[in-house]
Amino acid sequence: MSQEKQVFSIDLAGRQLTVETGQLAKQANGAVLVRYGDTAVLSTATASKEAKNVDFFPLTVNYEERLYAVGKIPGGFIKREGRPSEKAILASRLIDRPIRPLFADGFRNEVQVVSIVMSVDQDCSSEMAAMLGSSLALSISDIPFEGPIAGATVGRINGEFVINPTVEQQEQSDIHLVVAGTKDAINMVEAGADQVPEETMLEAIMFGHDEIKRLIAFQEEIVQAVGKEKSEVKLYEVDADLNQAVREMAEKDMHSAIQVHEKHAREDAINEVKKRVIEHYEAEEADADTLGQVNEILYKIVKEEVRRLITVEKIRPDGRKGDEIRPLASEVGILSRTHGSGLFTRGQTQALSICTLGALGDVQILDGLGVEESKRFMHHYNFPSFSVGETRPMRGPGRREIGHGALGERALEPVIPSEKDFPYTVRLVSEVLESNGSTSQASICGSTLAMMDAGVPLKAPVAGIAMGLVKSGEHYTILSDIQGMEDHLGDMDFKVAGTAQGVTALQMDIKIDGLSREILEEALQQAKIGRVHILNHMLSVIAEPRTELSAYAPKIITMTINPDKIRDVIGPSGKQINKIIEETGVKIDIEQDGTVFISSINQEMNDKAKKIIEDIVREVQVGEIYEGKVKRVEKFGAFVELFSGKDGLVHISELALERVGKVEDVVKIGDVITVKVIEIDKQGRVNLSRKVLLKEEQEKEAAKEEDKQEQQ
């Protein structure tokens, strides 16, 4: 690899993308600086010289955000970046997933790919720059990576597909798709959509793949110019004689154990075979390396037999047909004090989702490398160890939990009613109670049930299903509603969520080089059939959202005030609004256009707060009559409170019909009197009269008396 700085450029969606090599991070196995517009990402790849003594490929991908990239200084006392943001974690997963399948089986050297975001142009995706940079850093290095790969974001505006849409274009788009792959096939999909038909999603994926091919050709030119020769690495292999001996000892019994339909009984049967074989070699005092190889051989026996049964005999581990969905059971309203709850069970996978409604002030503020914005819909996913019958420390959410939560959020967001139609913040929490595959999709189904139970007026119910694939040469079998073993030992995990009308979210991960259009098309159509079946089941439990909210959910009333009056409601340093909140216990959120949201569990307090605000913003008109309380008495007259925050003066000459010597002779502080507005001067001061009303009353009485006399 040349140590001189070299620069390569290509046009990407009308903006220049530049790759620089040979100047930065030269001690890494591979390093590139990718500039896309004003976005700049440094991507590096390093690998250990020796293989690690582990039974998996130790790859770590880190997408590192630096706030200097957008000219910000971190908040807090420490003033430096802390733990990765949710966006950074999701970006790390996005890069990891298409890269991981492109390392050889048996490769055990530790590999770390790090992308540091150094400058951000909001219209030029730093995630896509990091994905390209990660692929290039590996490809030009001596690490035996079988890439390159590339990624592209695809939007659709007015029926036209757009590559790498700008922020403004994303707001208009009904598809938000990230697709990645090699020049020959697609190996990763992540998408959100607004109930888009399967055929359109497939076209969007293939449209993105056309751009991927162009970006890979660009990378191949760079590799040709500056790439290092790949290292010769010894791949992990088991001893041939040991392999034959273990297979003779275990294969027959393992084949029988695999065909036990119930998950735990099947696992017990498989573990019993493993235990017998391991104990045999332990009795022969086999060393740790030999025992490790024995475990590897036993794993391969299980994998090969499961795949053979599915592709050749068309038998799944639990006895189902390829397109068969496990038994479904659902229930709503099982938690009395929550605002809404839904329990969704599919075979041995179970999720309990809880919906909580809050005021608009409860929105989540997102402040990272992107434009600062708020989020009024949230979905969080928890995967406790008891869901798989295991024990482990209870810690915060990991990458997988954050990823599954984000997938559920993306699937449900298109059907959430607008703020205008439903002025609430909505938070969903999905607790996985049992796991045997497809828990993320169960959480989507449970969340739909919970929101319908809570009375959220969804545009349409959403269900999710996980599709699998087992491929052997040109032969393949697509599986609906995969369970844990099929996910673990198969070639694909393709999650599809949506309504009866179309797709709202996709996520695809594969363990092989890639998938053809034909397989993707078949998987999407089979997923649609399964999704509609699940939706019909859910609607048999609750046909439509409840018309009334829970008694324990906040009641929200909306009112509109003159925007010029907002400062009056807030008051100096928030004094006025805090007084209202303290007096009524409500939450108040005010938009710049003068829309006011008042929320509380107590409707009476909502009404009280509304009345106070109405009084504050009310405009006094000449001729209006008020019943007010005397707040202050002066020699020249009395000050009367017409309503909260608005006083007027009754001059001494306007207190009574007769001449008044002292104000106190007529009124005192605390008296409630009826007054009429007779003038509002240029300074906005309100002049009142009691005398005018007394005179009007006197004239009415005189007229009545006159009428009575005429009748006599």
From Swiss-Prot:
SUPFAM superfamilies: Eukaryotic type KH-domain (KH-domain type I) (SSF54791), Nucleic acid-binding proteins (SSF50249), Ribonuclease PH domain 2-like (SSF55666), Ribosomal protein S5 domain 2-like (SSF54211)
Names of required cofactors: Mg(2+)
EC number: 2.7.7.8
Domain of life per record: Bacteria
Top EC class, one word: transferase
InterPro entries recorded: ExoRNase_PH_dom1, ExoRNase_PH_dom2, ExoRNase_PH_dom2_sf, KH_dom, KH_dom_type_1, KH_dom_type_1_sf, NA-bd_OB-fold, PNPase
Keyword Nucleotidyltransferase: yes
Keywords: Cytoplasm, Magnesium, Metal-binding, Nucleotidyltransferase, RNA-binding, Transferase
GO biological process: mRNA catabolic process; RNA processing
Residue numbers binding Mg(2+): D487, D493
GO cellular component: cytosol
Compartments where found: Cytoplasm
Purpose: Involved in mRNA degradation. Catalyzes the phosphorolysis of single-stranded polyribonucleotides processively in the 3'- to 5'-direction.
Similarity comment: Belongs to the polyribonucleotide nucleotidyltransferase family.
Entry protein name: Polyribonucleotide nucleotidyltransferase
Organism: Bacillus cereus (strain G9842)
